[in-house]
Amino acid sequence: VNQVFTGVATSRTLLGQQETVVNGLVSPTGTPGRVKISTGPLSSQSPEGIVSVETAIALLKDMGGSSIKYFPMGGLKCRDEYIAVAQACARHDFWLEPTGGIDLDNFTEILQIALDAGVSKIIPHIYSSIIDKVSGNTRPDDVRQLMAMTRACVG
């Protein structure tokens, strides 16, 4: 379940179980090790709520979250920040969902950064970059390439 940061606890409670993955959206800030948690409908319109990645992870765990959805990454535009998030997720055994601007050109590096950090579960969100603009369908060859890249990274 994709959730803004402030919606994680409500989603987990309404689900009534722990099996479903519930992510919490945090955003880059321009400073490695710091993330913006003010991603809800009201908080996103207020002064930014910026905390350490470790604090964000602890809060998400408190609320029953399974993972950080790190968005918008812009591919590798915030590479150093993404590395810090991946390292924190690994240290605190928390899953990571890199999101935003992921395509066939940067997928391997994005996945490898999280693997090298030791993240236990990585759920990359790959959106429009593998969708045919004319038909609106997912390009099967792109999916095959992504699977091959994933296998090459994880062995």
Each language-model region and where it sits:
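Conserved binding-pocket/active-site segment within a compact domain
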Residues: 61-123
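C-terminal helical cap(s) of enzyme catalytic domains, especially alpha/beta-barrels
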Residues: 131-155
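Glycine-rich phosphate-binding active-site loops on the catalytic face of alpha/beta enzymes
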Residues: 1-9, 71-75, 114-140
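Conserved anion-binding
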Residues: 1-76
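Catalytic cores of alpha/beta
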Residues: 7-16, 55-56, 102-118, 141-142
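Charged/polar, solvent-exposed surface patches and flexible loops
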Residues: 55-62, 87, 112, 145-148, ...
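Alpha-helix-loop-beta-strand connector modules within alpha/beta enzyme cores
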Residues: 14-30, 80-98, 146-154
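Charged helix-capping and loop-helix junction motifs
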Residues: 49-54, 79-86, 139-142
